[in-house]
Amino acid sequence: MRNPLLQACAMALIGLTLAGCASTPAPSTIADTTARTPQLSTLNRLIVEAGLGDTLRSQGPFTVFAPSDDAFKAVPAKTLAELGSNKELLKSVLTFHVVPGKTMAADVKNGNAKTVNGANLALGKAGTMVTVEEAVVVQADVAASNGVVHVIDRVLLPPKQ
């Protein structure tokens, strides 16, 4: 290139392209998203206790129906104590909230979805309202690099086995 103006424009374009790439943060994983969301602090603590952090940082994709802190406050103290003392039960309950694949709220259909723990979750949709078992999605489509998180208003308990 002999034209100095053309050279300057090309260099500016390259610089802007590189600057744009550098300023775009990598999306957070589901585990990182729950960890930095204040209303999911109880869920995050339980994910750590159950040893599921690495799973929720893996490639996925996953759809997580994440009970809010208020949802955990509604769980009887006896049930919470049992979850705290039984790691396998805790894992079973938490993985009952996780469905393989990435399902955005707009894509939810009435029917069942198989969870990571092997049980089925009943999903429902009426207009824009999405339900999961008896829970209502109160915040939908929280994007993560390995899936999506939907905040729900209840803790889901898997069927007795």
Predicted regions and their residues:
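Mature, structured domains of secreted/extracytosolic soluble proteins
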Residues: R2-Q161
